[in-house]
Amino acid sequence: MKKSYLIKPLLDSHYPTAEYGKGIYIYDDQHKQYIDGSSGAVTASIGHAVPEIIEAMLRQAEKISFVYRSQFTTEEAEKLAERLSQIDFIKEGHYSSFFVNSGSEATETAMKIAIQHWQEQGMPTKNKVISRWTSYHGITMGSLSLSGHSERRRRFVSLLDDLPTIPAPYCYRCPFNQEYPGCQLKCATELEVAIQRMGADNIAAFIAEPIIGAAGAVIFPPEGYYEKIKEICDKHHILFIADEVMTGIGRTGKMLAMEHWGVVPDIITLGKGMSAGYTPLAATLVSEKVMEPILQGSKIIMSGHTYSANPQSAAVSLAVLDYIEKHNLVEKAAENGDYLLTQLQGLAKNYSIIGDVRGKGLMVGIEFVANVFSKFPFSKDKSLTNIIVSVAREKGLLIYPASAGIEGGDGDAVIISPPLTIKKHEIDQLVEIFKETIAEVQSEIIGDHHQKIISLDDHQ
């Protein structure tokens, strides 16, 4: 085999070579077809090789592809910032945008701006940004410090701040062994406890993914959770940052996932879907309330990247947003997401390794368990998630490996999040391959004794 000089995620693994993509499909150099059932890393939200996006890329390349942000602004970057500020749900907040290349950078920028917001008002001790366990906000040291993802933190723990402070709203595995609504949203009121312990004078902001992605396989909270979180933040003069890198730009059936709960954040991070994978691009959106002390003070955001506000990327993002709007993809994500969720929930009745199926829009998480009644996970040495992802890929379906389970990490789960352009007959095709995958894994790898021979009703 020819030596590869490319550092890949698993250094001893063989990866197929992608040759081209079309719509929801990717084709390798052996002409094998794959359904992009996860939009890559929940990124390729409008599918592959969309002509309108390619045309926008070419038009901008002929015009100008790079200027440095301290020397020029561009029409494309200005238009994109204005376009994002006009998202209906946040329009009244008059948000300004800081453009970067990745979600990790967007998180870092959000942290810096939140801290600077308080520094400009003479409150330098408000310099901690706290978060939740069972979360993932990025792989840079600052964003990883915020991430309650034990596996990704482990190698660098000596370099990281311990910023995750409260448990996630993980109703399938409630950390308090309670049930909603009798729990009285203890997962949210724990933020109050954490603030009292640390002191509000030391906390700049609280960050959360509206729907937890990689660390929890689409965990979303019970009703009233984010209302309570925002109430607590406002009470203690703490900014609320919503990490919408994975959930934003239509993925959940709303332009922004926070719209499901009607709670408007002070700062929002975006990525992935805002360029749909056609270019590296992310953004930190900052409300007028947060910007005002900086505008009245130093008048500079202490952050910067070489490719920030890149006009080529901005032009691509504008074309992606146009395409989403023209084809009503946010509404279609809601409609087709309900269909996908129903189809996948139907599988759980027949396969006992499926513990929970949860989702909003075209973002669905499937958590696997060794025992459907105790919810006990499989042992780590089984590497069940990797097996399921591998078998699905062999059958022509790409799905996203995620964490879940006890302590939000000792368990197995995947995310299914196809492009927003997927049609119902393509969903049927996706679900059929996933069904074949689970059937094979359960019967041949896990063992026949896991075949579901009694229904939940019989058990009860």
Model feature map: region roles:
Residues 1-460:
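Conserved N-terminal phosphate-binding loop of PLP-dependent enzymes in the Aspartate aminotransferase
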